[in-house]
Amino acid sequence: FQCLPESRSTQDVKQIVITASGGPFHGKNIDELNNVGVQDALNHPNWEMGSKISIDSATLVNKCLELIEACYLFDMDESFFELVIHPESIVHSIVTFNDGSSICQMSNPDMRVPIANAMSYDKRLSIPFQPIDFNNLKLNFESFPNDRAEIVHLAREAVREDSSKGIYFNAAN
């Protein structure tokens, strides 16, 4: 929401990108995950989070839930949203407008930043955090893994078809 105009109008928005780090299993195909354990899934490379969100990140379900949430929050069709892997976890979202320009929300992977932003909306709290070192910054983006397409399809279907399907999706998770 920080990348949208103050009016929160979405009429000029062409696309919103939601980024995912890929979690602890980034780069592994689904067949390689047959023998991983809970501790493997809890070992996130970038974020320190609770167990539930760490597991959701490892399965990439958290981004499907964010997709469902964003559709309702911004009152936008699911087709406006794209899920993209961004291993560095620096860019958290990107809004692309009809004129071709894009604005992104960036910070180092520190949960205090989004929590503070949510709790203090529409002000910015002064919190101790490590700013981005733009002199040594490298950003990579990858397509969402094809072998996870079914779960994304289910999330999109939940938004398209019936609001209760989002509840079912979350409960099944």
What residue ranges belong to the model's regions?
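Catalytic, metal-anchored helix/loop core of enzyme active sites in primary metabolism
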Residues: 1-173
